[in-house]
């Protein structure tokens, strides 16, 4: 009798749903603005609400190198937030599944205010030292560096490049339009940086899924489509357009 009781008890306990990691390597505003704060956490909250907890999405903050290591595993089963196919070696969208856009963004060219650079095309950067972030890919920039038309010098963080720019150690860097005001409005940089009136590029941000998650792909696309029309989500985005 006792055996049947324990068997009934075991079967009556609800099975724990699947948890999937949402990787994010953007360790700067607006995506991460402090402990347990930032747009990435808002995204996780929104996705979990729309998915009804099945599966449950869990945020994992990593650097670009760690993400590359995780994704090199053939059994990789996570999602990656805020990325573009061109950055992930998948311009034709053949290696991974991609959600509809969840954000539209730009790359803004920043230079020292004492030596302002206006971006009018790749030739604007010839002979300059460009400050990049380790592991990041830059359309147009990387090709020019490969041809020897400019020098790419990497740092670990966006903020480090802005500090190097102020000190004259590099000539230009790129900051995403979504992040720009978080840095430029800082007292530390005020009046010291020049923003080109023309962005270096514009692009869309997506959620990457492995090919094995076709079951989730359609659901995330439905959510991404809703996000674009959801006033509540637009209000969240708007709240991260300036300095916290």
Task: Outline where the language-model segments fall.
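Extracytoplasmic small-molecule ligand-binding "clamshell" domains
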Residues: 17-91, 132, 154-155
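Periplasmic-binding protein-like
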Residues: 24-27, 103-108, 185-224, 243-244
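Ligand-binding clefts/hinges and TM-proximal coupling segments of bilobed small-molecule sensing domains
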Residues: 55-56, 136-147, 225-244
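Short helices/loops that flank or line small-molecule/ion binding pockets
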Residues: 58, 65-78, 158-179, 186
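Acidic, polar ligand-binding/catalytic clefts
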Residues: 58-125, 138, 197-199
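A ligand-binding cleft/hinge motif common to bilobed small-molecule-binding domains
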Residues: 79-92, 171-201
């Amino acid at each position: 009798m006792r055996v049947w009781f324990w068997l009934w008890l075991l079967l009556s306990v609800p099975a724990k749903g699947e948890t999937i990691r949402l990787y994010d390597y953007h360790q700067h505003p607006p995506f991460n603005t402090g402990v347990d704060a930032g747009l990435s956490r808002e995204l996780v909250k929104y996705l979990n609400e729309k998915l009804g907890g099945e599966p449950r999405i869990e945020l994992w903050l990593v650097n670009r190198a760690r993400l590359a290591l995780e994704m090199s595993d053939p059994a990789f089963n996570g999602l990656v937030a805020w990325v573009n196919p061109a950055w992930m070696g998948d311009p034709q969208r053949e290696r991974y599944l991609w959600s509809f856009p969840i954000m539209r963004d730009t790359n803004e060219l920043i230079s020292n205010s004492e030596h302002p650079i206006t971006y009018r095309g790749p030739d604007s950067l010839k002979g300059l030292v460009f400050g990049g972030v380790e592991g990041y890919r830059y359309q147009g920039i990387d090709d020019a560096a490969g041809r020897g038309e400019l020098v790419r010098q990497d740092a670990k963080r966006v903020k480090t490049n802005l500090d190097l720019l102020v000190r004259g150690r590099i000539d230009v860097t790129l900051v995403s339009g979504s992040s720009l005001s978080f840095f430029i409005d800082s007292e530390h940089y005020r009046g010291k940086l020049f923003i080109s009136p023309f962005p270096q590029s514009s692009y869309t941000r997506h959620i990457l899924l492995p090919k094995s998650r076709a079951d989730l792909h359609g659901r995330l696309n439905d959510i991404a489509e809703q996000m674009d029309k959801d006033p509540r989500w637009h209000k969240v985005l708007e709240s991260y357009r300036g300095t916290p």
